[in-house]
UniProtKB/Swiss-Prot annotation:
Lineage, uppermost ranks: Bacteria, Bacillati, Mycoplasmatota, Mycoplasmoidales, Metamycoplasmataceae
Residues that coordinate or bind ATP: 169-176
Gene3D superfamilies referenced in this protein's UniProt entry, alphabetically: 2.40.30.20, ATP synthase alpha/beta chain, C-terminal domain, P-loop containing nucleotide triphosphate hydrolases
Record-linked NCBIfam families: atpA, PRK13343.1
Subunit structure: F-type ATPases have 2 components, CF(1) - the catalytic core - and CF(0) - the membrane proton channel. CF(1) has five subunits: alpha(3), beta(3), gamma(1), delta(1), epsilon(1). CF(0) has three main subunits: a(1), b(2) and c(9-12). The alpha and beta chains form an alternating ring which encloses part of the gamma chain. CF(1) is attached to CF(0) by a central stalk formed by the gamma and epsilon chains, while a peripheral stalk is formed by the delta and b chains.
Main location: membrane
GO cellular component: plasma membrane; proton-transporting ATP synthase complex
Compartment list: Cell membrane
Protein name: ATP synthase subunit alpha 1
Enzyme Commission code: 7.1.2.2
Species: Mycoplasmopsis pulmonis (strain UAB CTIP) (Mycoplasma pulmonis)
Site (Required for activity): 362
Family the entry assigns: Belongs to the ATPase alpha/beta chains family.
Length: 528
């Protein structure tokens, strides 16, 4: 039946009469798809990048993609609670966390929520986790040492407060051990520490927390954990949460050490997120902005001037390599961002040289400006001595006829490497280190057989930490930060006495089988 004009006109009039003006709310949207921790949401036209979205009044998400018809949201919680058609609301807020001294001694997740069962964090201070790094004019040059307690690092690869020093190497070569030892060594030095675990096993993180507690380090340390069982968005956010906690301390004039363990897993988490958000992949399937991902994070580590708080953040990012390949994409990215790298080598680790630091490949671009004068003086030629030793070691494989100077280089080098060996969780203070390296520099270790070098090292550490006279000399180094001729001579006398005690205790020891102590130092004891 055809409609007449009159009927059409009455229908239109009826529709106009009953029409209600409804305001379209562009602050509330709908989930159009959900999966793998990513939700696509339509209807939120004015949302900002990095803004928090709330689903069903309970689950939060982070806006990462802004498309014409929909937005991509990373779910920060259990995505199984969501389904297509669920409501999504803007919060008009970006992610912020609680910061301040109350967070020390606690284990938190990437959202700043406590996961250690010790109750809520009682802090009123909140900070946004995505912030711009301090500008050039807000910074100061790095000129103060951050002692790690590790002989090889403090002598040849010195780290300064405000520096970014990469720890890079294959898996199971002691990278985390170096970082944990550095944290333990900050006890009593008024340095706050943050350990960020990205993609680690929960059991590994629990073990690290226990070790820090056993050594009294949790008093000044906070642990941020985004374990392997958590979704990619949480692993992506964890390092930014860690550095945000550190920035609060830096801006109140305090020094902070932050460890990112590790940024390889962080890059993988970001790659996963990017691929799920349908961003175009680049080299090794990483997105084009993966360099910026790490540069914006590591540039937040700095030594700032007094107008900006006067504190510092020292960063120790960790990168895992495959088969010692430091030319991989993420490895070269982070090497170019940081101020040097500590390279751990599997062959050294397996040969018993621990920490397994390859001194030849490792470098600190801050250099000796971060060392006290005494350390600078006694370690100036150490790297060269080890380079000569490694060169001669390769050369000596081809022939047994070696001259005396080559034998001396090989013997001295092997003794230095023996002194550089160090057990985990046993950091040595930098003033005791100065004394050990003085013994090397002055060739006082000549008469000691290689197998007794570790005994000599223990004797010196014990002597200069227990004996009143020796302890007084160490205090003078701490106060003056340099070695006067008189102080050097007094320390040399004590070292020679300890060497004599060791050689006397060796059965069938023949001094003629070993090079003597240089005459100028031997005289000091004889003339006493």
């Amino acid at each position: 039946m055809a409609l007449k004009n009159k009927d059409i006109s009455s229908i239109i009039k009826e529709r106009i009469r009953n029409y209600k003006i409804e305001k379209i709310n562009d602050e509330v949207g709908k989930v159009i798809s959900i999966g793998d921790g990513i939700a696509l949401v339509s209807g939120l036209k004015n949302v900002k990048n990095g803004e928090l979205i709330i689903f069903n009044e309970s689950v939060y998400g982070l806006t990462l993609n802004l498309e014409i018809d929909y937005i991509g949201v990373a779910i920060l919680g259990n995505d199984t609670l969501l389904k297509e058609g669920d409501e999504a609301k803007r919060t008009f807020e970006v992610i912020s966390i609680k910061v301040g001294p109350e967070i020390l001694g606690r284990v938190i997740n990437a959202l700043g929520e406590p996961i250690d069962g010790k109750g809520e964090i009682d802090s009123e201070i909140h900070r946004q986790i995505f912030r711009v790094a301090p500008g050039v004019m807000a910074r100061e040059s790095v000129n103060e040492a951050l002692s790690t307690g590790i002989l090889a690092i403090d002598s040849m690869i010195p780290i300064g407060k405000g520096q970014r020093e990469l720890i890079i190497g294959d898996r199971q070569t002691g990278k985390t051990a170096i970082a944990i030892d550095a944290i333990i060594n900050q006890k009593g030095k008024n340095v706050k520490c943050i350990y960020v675990a990205i993609g680690q096993k929960n059991s590994t993180v629990a073990q690290i927390v226990r070790k820090l507690e056993n050594h009294g380090a949790m008093e000044y340390t906070s642990v941020v954990s985004a374990s392997a069982s958590e979704l990619s968005p949480m692993q992506y956010l964890a390092p930014y949460t860690g550095v945000t906690i550190a920035e609060e301390f830096m801006e109140t004039g305090q020094d902070v050490l932050i460890v990112y363990d590790d940024l390889s897993k962080h890059a993988v988490a970001y790659r996963t997120l990017s691929l799920l958000l349908r961003r175009p992949p680049g080299r090794e399937a990483y997105p084009g902005d993966v360099f910026y991902l790490h540069s914006q994070l590591l540039e937040r580590a700095a030594k700032v001037n007094k107008e900006n708080g006067g504190g510092s953040i020292t960063a120790l990012p960790i990168i895992e390599t495959q088969q010692g390949d430091i030319s991989a994409y993420i490895a070269t990215n982070v090497i170019s961002i940081t101020d040097g790298q500590i390279f751990t080598k599997e062959s050294l680790f397996n040969s018993g040289q621990r920490p397994a630091i390859d001194v030849g490949f490792s470098v600190s671009r801050v250099g000796s400006s971060a060392q006290i004068s005494a350390m600078k003086e006694v370690t100036s030629s150490l790297k060269l001595q080890l380079a000569q030793y490694n060169e001669m070691l390769a050369f000596s494989q081809f022939g047994s006829d070696l001259d005396d100077s080559t034998k001396a280089i090989l013997e001295n080098g092997s003794k230095i490497y023996e002194i550089l060996k160090q057990d985990q969780y046993s950091p040595i203070d930098q003033y005791t280190q100065v004394i050990l390296f003085l013994a090397i520099k002055q060739n006082l270790i000549n008469p000691i057989p290689l197998e007794y070098i570790s005994k000599f090292k223990k004797a010196i550490i014990h002597k200069f930490n227990k004996d009143a006279k020796a302890l007084n000399l160490k205090t003078l180094i701490r106060n003056d930060k340099k070695l006067s001729t008189k102080l050097r001579n007094e320390i040399t006398k004590i070292i020679i006495e300890e060497i004599k005690n060791i050689t006397k205790s060796i059965a069938n020891y023949n001094p003629k089988d070993h090079r003597p102590i240089p005459e100028e130092y031997a005289k000091l004891v004889e003339s006493k």
